[in-house]
Amino acid sequence: MAASSYVDGERDMEKGGMILLQSSENQNPMIDPSPTPSPSATATAPALVLSNSGKRMDQAGKKKYVKQVTGRHNDTELHLAAQRGDLAAVQQILKDINSQMEGILSGEEFDAEVAEIRASIVNEVNELGETALFTAADKGHLDVVKELLKYSSRESIAKKNRSGYDPLHIAAIQGHHAIVEVLLDHDATLSQTFGPSNATPLVSAAMRGHTEVVNQLLSKAGNLLEISRSNNKNALHLAARQGHVEVIKALLSKDPQLARRIDKKGQTALHMAVKGQSSEVVKLLLDADPAIVMQPDKSCNTALHVATRKKRAEIVELLLSLPDTNANTLTRDHKTALDIAEGLPLSEESSYIKECLARSGALRANELNQPRDELRSTVTQIKNDVHIQLEQTKRTNKNVHNISKELRKLHREGINNATNSVTVVAVLFATVAFAAIFTVPGGDNNDGSAVVVGRASFKIFFIFNALALFTSLAVVVVQITLVRGETKAEKRVVEVINKLMWLASMCTSVAFLASSYIVVGRKNEWAAELVTVVGGVIMAGVLGTMTYYVVKSKRTRSMRKKVKSARRSGSNSWHHSDFSNSEVDPIFAI
């Protein structure tokens, strides 16, 4: 019963099994389908290769597909036919789908089902993740590729195998330019694929010297020149390393500036070329851009250093013949090309390289007169000295700033002490002046008026005592209402208050002298006159002396300001100190 269910399903097991398409009416539901055909099965219907998933798929109870595979990597019959390049076998496998579906479905349902089965067969992958199209592109079977493209989906064409390559990329690697052309004509965006290490098809083809493939890719996607591998090596780097002359010509004709591009090590294509054996490649690169002959990499190696280290005698001779070549440039290790050559094992190539270098005037590093290095050392020393000076200046400015803060603090404390002292003195003046009006000289009458109210001395006493009182009170009011904090502003207020205190002192003195005439009486006026002379001389002397020094101090400050202004206008490198910033700040009062 089980054997009869696999109609014409048996094939040679060494070639592998196949998928059987059959009607569900002829299948015993109690028998588990197996991918291994029964030896007793009779062949009446062709087989279809559909899937290597190993699963049974039942659709609407009408049909069943059973997977059978063969080959090293679970290849289907379609894979094997594509690998052989057997176009007839490929066409037969795809054609058998129609014959097997006849009688089961019809009309649009038939066409849709056939298309679905055909797509499943064509897009099937083996254990390596390769479709039949990939296999045909890898082996270079153009006709098979064209046939499979008719039934391949966009995802299948761009599908990568486990190594990271798609059909276009593998065709470029193998140099199958006709297949590359067919695939690009089918879908030009396939050229934008990336393989391992971010390699494009152009990079892979250039590295292997497939000139026709390179030309095909450049004609369809010129932007591939701008895309490098993950190490920043582009197609020109890799082609130059392998010495592919025609590929170099094709790439440079597309973009001559490509010769200047560097990889992560700072190497140009010339650095890569001198590692190889082709002098012609070196000539092509130098013709495209002669300046790159002295372009160093990140280790300061020029092409001459690299060629010497690789013992490329012919290339060394070519480089030394160029007028731009300097045979005495130093690497980061402070070595010239001659130092490198002398460090090579003794051989015919190393001896010839040393001869070429000697003829070109090459010297050892310790023999060089190195003014540039000395200049660099001097400049470095100057930079260090300037840096030290700047640091010292910075520290000095910081110290000056701190000293300035301390001076402002001391100055503010001095002003506060002065204002406090002035306040105390002003209060004393006001107290004396206020008390004097109630204890007038000569006593009072019964009605409270002064006994000597009619005398001129009493009137002088009364007026100047009042002036002393109100002046002192004004000073007290200013002192208790002033908002402190601005040194210069407080200083100006103190100057004004000092003048008021002078006035209060003078008024108090006059009031005292006037009251002395009242107290001593007319018989002893000589005593009052003596007190007047003594007091007047003392007060006049003190006030006159203070006035002189105040005026002199103001003149001195004015001269200093002029000198500072002249210095500031002559040099823009100095700025106003924080201490002077408070000079223009206003006075704020409650």
UniProtKB/Swiss-Prot annotation:
Example GO BP: response to salt stress
Signal sequence segment: none
Domain of life: Eukaryota
SMART domains: ANK
Keywords: ANK repeat, Cell membrane, Membrane, Repeat, Stress response, Transmembrane, Transmembrane helix
Disruption phenotype: No visible phenotype under normal growth conditions, but mutant seedlings show increased salt-stress tolerance.
PROSITE patterns membership: ANK_REP_REGION, ANK_REPEAT
SS bond list: none
Stimuli inducing this protein: By salt and drought stresses.
Entry-linked InterPro entries: Ankyrin_rpt, Ankyrin_rpt-contain_sf, PGG_dom
Topology with respect to the bilayer: Multi-pass membrane protein
Tissue occurrence: Expressed in roots, shoots, leaf vasculature and stems.
Record localization: Cell membrane
Regions crossing the membrane: 422-442, 460-480, 500-520, 531-551
ANK repeats: 73-102, 128-157, 163-192, 197-226, 231-260, 265-294, 299-329
Region Disordered, residue ranges: 25-44
GO cellular component, one term: nucleus
Assembly, per entry: Interacts with REM19/RTV1.
Function: Involved in salt stress tolerance. May act through abscisic acid (ABA) signaling pathways and promote reactive oxygen species (ROS) production.
Protein name per UniProt: Ankyrin repeat-containing protein ITN1
Native species: Arabidopsis thaliana (Mouse-ear cress)
Gene (UniProt): ITN1
